[in-house]
């Protein structure tokens, strides 16, 4: 009989703190075993991310998503909204982890041990996997929102403050998914 206990660790990361539009999306992942190629999602091409996301979903012991919508970001601020989204991802896991590691310097309030690791998305495979899943999901959502709100270019810049996005914002004004608490959206509304 095997008496060795397996400690279940969930990695958590977010995507979408900086954009002017769209939700902040988080993922929590518990891996069964290491997956080759995992790293910070920003270091991967879209094709690499998509292929790894498929493998993560197939091979992970468990994964779940969390999010904070634009209204929550504007009401709470991005820091607190991100921590809320992280908590939601962990709470949505079908398996309760023994501990949680989070990319960054802050941890969400959880009823289980949680540790923040700066640059964890490059150092901890579970956080890397969460980074990839969150990035792929948010990018897919922004492509879909581009069809609902044409003219802003969400499919290309994913809501970030690119020159194209800022120009569209000046021309069209903000739409429902713009973060009213963010400059230049707030500046435009106040004029």
Swiss-Prot record:
Listed Pfam families: RNase_HII (PF01351)
Subcellular location per the Swiss-Prot or TrEMBL entry: Cytoplasm
Occurrences of domain RNase H type-2 (ranges): 7-191
GO cellular component: cytoplasm; ribonuclease H2 complex
Annotated keywords: Cytoplasm, Endonuclease, Hydrolase, Manganese, Metal-binding, Nuclease
SUPFAM superfamilies tied to this protein: Ribonuclease H-like
Alphabetized PROSITE patterns for the sequence: RNASE_H_2
A biological process term (GO) from this entry: mismatch repair
Family matches, as InterPro entries: RNase_HII, RNase_HII/HIII, RNase_HII/HIII_dom, RNaseH-like_sf, RNaseH_sf
Cofactor(s) the protein needs: Mn(2+); Mg(2+)
Primary role: Endonuclease that specifically degrades the RNA of RNA-DNA hybrids.
Family membership noted in the UniProt record: Belongs to the RNase HII family.
Protein name per Swiss-Prot or TrEMBL: Ribonuclease HII
């Amino acid at each position: 009989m095997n008496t060795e206990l397996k400690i279940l660790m969930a990695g958590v990361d977010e995507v979408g703190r900086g954009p002017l539009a769209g939700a902040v999306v988080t993922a929590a992942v518990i891996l069964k075993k290491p997956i080759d190629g995992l790293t910070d999602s920003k270091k991967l091409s879209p094709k690499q991310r998509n292929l790894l996301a498929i493998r993560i979903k197939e091979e992970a012991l468990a994964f779940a998503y969390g999010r904070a919508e634009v209204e929550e970001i504007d009401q709470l601020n991005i820091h607190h909204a991100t921590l809320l989204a992280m908590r939601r991802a962990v709470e949505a896991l079908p398996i309760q982890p023994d501990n949680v590691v989070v990319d960054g310097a802050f941890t969400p309030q959880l009823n289980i041990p949680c540790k923040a690791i700066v640059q964890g998305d490059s150092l901890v495979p579970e956080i890397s996997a969460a980074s990839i899943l969150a990035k792929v999901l948010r990018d897919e959502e922004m492509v879909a929102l581009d069809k609902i709100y044409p003219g802003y270019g969400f499919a290309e810049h994913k809501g970030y403050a690119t020159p194209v996005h800022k120009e569209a914002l000046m021309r069209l004004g903000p739409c429902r998914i713009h973060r009213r608490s963010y400059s230049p959206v707030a500046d435009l509304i106040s004029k």
